[in-house]
A protein has these predicted regions:
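Von Willebrand factor type A / integrin I
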Residues: 85-152
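Von Willebrand factor
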Residues: 25-64, 101, 106-107
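Short, well-ordered secondary-structure micro-motifs
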Residues: 14-18, 78-79, 107
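Exposed acidic/Ser/Thr-rich ligand/metal-binding surfaces
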Residues: 49-93, 124, 137-145
């Protein structure tokens, strides 16, 4: 299991989760050491997908599951759909958990609709009930949707 965090840049934090059990300490270490913010402090999904593709995609295989937790807001930057598509194609399953209400998806700078076709499941997740729904769906054997696979 590998874990990554991002804002403008992506950073692997697997070691932080392996060495710390306190949520407060994990949060502190990530905030101070992860190097995820560059200049603006605004999310840059496109840059993140390019970096992830270039550094991690070769480690993905059909047994891999990629889970993204984010609002898909690009702040007007290029979403680099092709990079995300390559990541999703390399993984066995790709899921997206969006903490914003669905009402706000694809509104303003949200590009959820750009990434959704490459995902096996996209979940609105801003309540504990919605989180439970996501966990149940991911835990189901064969939860990969054939429609999502055909679009890749």
């Amino acid at each position: 299991l590998r874990s990554f965090v991002f804002i403008e840049r992506i950073s692997e934090v697997t070691d932080v989760f392996a060495s710390e059990r306190s949520f407060a300490e994990v949060s502190r270490k990530i905030a101070s050491d992860a190097g995820v913010a560059d200049v603006s402090g605004y999310t840059d999904y496109g840059r993140v997908w390019l970096e992830f593709r270039d550094t991690v995609v070769d480690d993905l295989d059909p047994r891999s599951t990629v889970i993204v937790l984010g609002d898909a807001r690009t702040n007007g930057r290029d979403p680099h759909e092709h990079a995300f598509a390559k990541i999703a194609a390399a993984a066995g399953r790709t899921f997206w958990i969006n903490p914003e209400p669905k009402l706000y998806w694809n509104y303003g700078d949200s590009v959820m609709g750009v990434y959704e076709p490459y995902c096996d499941g996209v979940f609105e997740c801003w309540t504990t009930h919605q989180l439970e729904t996501f966990v149940r769906a991911v835990a189901q054997p064969g939860s990969v949707t054939q429609a999502a696979r055909r679009r890749r």
